[in-house]
């Protein structure tokens, strides 16, 4: 089962918004929010809440790809999230999330008995490539014990 399939099966908002997983690696995840009139805002583009969910979901996908092998001993949790809306979004938008620290450094902190935190940067773009939003989600790996 792919990360996209797993998240679609376990996170209802992924199914609700029909998010599409275009690429998922331990360094980067790319998701798309299809253009759907039921999730438009007052100016006919994707609602800010839908774009936030897209960005947070992309960040979660890269976290799972990078740290999926640690799930037996730690649970990934979003700590903070900040988004800046830059331009009007229209049509399908994509979110590209990139891990902000080397995964090995994060795992080393976990190995030391600490609860590591790390940023994931997200860029949201229209189909023409224009950046419509930028987001940072800080994640932690909370040890299970």
Residue ranges and their predicted role:
Residues 1-12:
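Extreme N-terminal tail/first-helix region
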Residues 16, 26, 46, 76-80, ...:
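Short connector loops at helix/strand junctions that flank enzyme active sites
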Residues 62-101:
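Hydrophobic beta-strand-centered segment that forms part of the acyl-chain substrate-binding groove
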Residues 15-19, 79-85, 105-107:
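Short structured motifs
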Residues 16-46:
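Catalytic strand-loop segment that frames the active site of acyl-thioester-processing enzymes
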Residues 34, 38-61, 72:
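Hot-dog-fold acyl-thioester-processing enzymes
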Residues 14-15, 134:
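N-terminal intrinsically disordered, cationic/polar leader segments
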Residues 89-90, 100-145:
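HotDog/MaoC-like acyl-thioester-processing domains
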């Amino acid at each position: 089962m792919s990360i996209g399939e797993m998240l679609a099966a376990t996170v209802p908002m992924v199914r609700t918004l029909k998010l599409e997983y275009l690429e998922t690696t331990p360094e980067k995840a790319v998701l798309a929010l299809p253009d759907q009139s039921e999730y438009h805002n007052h100016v006919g583009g994707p609602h800010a809440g839908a774009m936030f969910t897209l960005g947070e979901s992309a960040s979660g996908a890269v976290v799972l790809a990078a740290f999926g092998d640690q799930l037996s001993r730690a649970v990934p949790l979003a700590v903070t999230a900040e988004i800046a809306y830059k331009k009007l979004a229209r049509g399908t938008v994509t979110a590209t999330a990139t891990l902000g620290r080397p995964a090995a450094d994060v795992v080393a902190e976990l190995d030391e008995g600490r609860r590591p935190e790390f940023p994931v940067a997200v860029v949201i773009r229209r189909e023409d490539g224009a950046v419509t939003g930028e987001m940072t989600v800080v994640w932690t790996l909370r040890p299970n014990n």
